[in-house]
Every structure is written in structure tokens, then in C-alpha cells.
Regions:
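A broad, structure-centric signal for solvent-exposed, well-ordered loop/edge residues
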Residues: 2-3, 15, 136-137, 147, ...
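Long, internal scaffold/assembly segments composed of regular secondary structure
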Residues: 4-21, 25-41
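Repeated scaffold domains used in trafficking and secretory/extracellular systems
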Residues: 1-10, 48-68, 97-110, 141-154, ...
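Surface-exposed loop/turn elements that mediate protein-protein interactions on large endomembrane-trafficking
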Residues: 1, 28-54, 75-98, 121-141, ...
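Short beta-strand elements that form the blades of beta-propeller/WD-repeat-like
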Residues: 12-25, 62-75, 79-81, 106-121, ...
């Protein structure tokens, strides 16, 4: 098959790769787990192969190790969470089908976030945050034209070049404001309850609500 994306575990011994391949004229996807420390029984170091059958003809465009024993697969049909606690036997622990159009994804060491279209009316977008096992943390609809989407510590950050919107992990809005300079990046501040807003010419730290 053709590799689409790959991710190395933090200690460098495990690798996930998403492949596209042709099967009877249909393009399909498979996820392959490799282990270079313990996978010696297989000359290719393969310890697990998964076909996202339940997600139909999904294409897994992004695969990521969150830490040594948790990984996540993002496809156009949903999210799959895997455990490699037993390094020679990767296990699918949670699968979340997503029917709406997925606009953005983000991930941190212990959280995963997606923004989809909101098909239920009202606000145009829906934000969903999950923990590294795939359990829902919160979901919220919003109406905000963002270009950046990140998770930093216990903050979810949505921002564009002139403003930002910030939620905590209960879905409470902690900040919603504009800036008088061009914004290139927003992150959690140096101290709890603060936000660092960075631009090409300026950097400012603000206090959250």
C-alpha cells in the first residue's frame, strides 16, 4: 500500500502507519503497528494490522501517538483510539463515528479535539473534546471564524489573526476577545489562569475570566 501518515512513539520504539491500498478496484485503508523493540518475531516488526471496517471506506489521514501507550487515528469518518499498553498486541479501545464534515483536528498528550459542522441548526460549528481513551470530555456549538485550533494543558484555544476564544475542560468560556495587533499563535500562559498571545511584533499575557 501507499503510506498516508505515520507517527513514532515518544521513546522511538513503536510506529503507526496509515496505508491506502487497492482492493478489487476500491481504495481502502489499513493501520499497521510496528514495534522495533519487541516485534522481533516478525521480520517486518509488525505487531498489529487494523482495517477500519466499521468506518466504511474511511481514509485515515492522520495517525498520532499521544504517549507511549495511547494513540489515535483520525479519518474522514471518525476517530479511533488504540492502546499499546501491551506493546506486542495493540488494542482498539474506542471508536467514534462522525457523520458531519470534520473541519479541524487537534491533539495533546491526554486530550483530542475535533471541530465539525453543526447540522442541528443554530451555531455553524460543533467542538468535541475526548480524553486519550476516547471518553467524551465536553462538546459545544459555537459561531466563530477561527484559523487556529489547539489544546494546551486544560485550555481549548480557537483563534484567528485578530481575536481568540478560550474554553476550559468543562466547556466554560474563559475568554472571548479581540487584539489590536496581528495574532500568529495563542497558548496557555506561564501561570495558571493566564493566556499568552503572540504576534510577529508583539507578545502579551492576559488573565482569563
Amino acid at each position: 500500500g501507499y503510506p498516508v501518515d505515520l507517527s513514532l512513539s515518544p521513546n522511538g520504539t513503536q510506529l503507526i502507519t496509515s496505508y491506502m491500498y487497492l482492493d478489487q478496484g476500491m481504495i481502502k485503508c489499513k493501520i499497521v503497528f510496528y514495534n522495533f523493540g519487541l516485534g522481533k518475531n516478525d521480520p517486518n516488526r509488525v505487531v498489529g494490522i487494523f482495517f477500519p471496517k466499521d468506518l466504511g471506506d474511511a481514509m485515515a489521514g492522520r495517525v498520532r501517538f499521544l504517549d507511549e501507550s495511547h494513540s489515535v487515528i483520525f479519518s474522514d469518518k471518525g476517530i479511533q483510539f488504540f492502546s499499546t499498553r501491551v506493546e506486542t498486541s495493540p488494542e482498539l479501545v474506542s471508536q467514534i463515528p462522525i457523520e458531519e464534515n470534520i473541519r479541524s483536528i487537534t491533539y495533546a498528550q491526554d486530550k483530542v479535539g475535533i471541530v465539525t459542522d453543526n447540522v442541528e441548526g443554530g451555531d455553524p460549528y460543533k467542538l468535541r473534546i475526548y480524553d486519550r481513551e476516547g471518553s467524551p470530555v465536553f462538546e459545544k456549538t459555537f459561531n466563530y471564524q477561527y484559523t487556529g485550533f489547539d489544546i494546551d494543558g486544560d485550555l481549548v484555544l480557537l483563534y484567528n489573526d485578530s481575536s481568540c476564544k478560550v474554553y476550559n475542560m468543562t466547556g466554560t468560556e474563559k475568554y472571548n476577545g479581540t487584539f489590536d495587533f496581528t495574532v500568529s499563535k495563542v497558548s496557555a500562559g506561564r501561570f495558571p489562569g493566564t493566556l499568552l498571545v503572540m504576534g510577529p511584533q508583539k507578545m502579551t499575557e492576559i488573565k482569563l475570566q
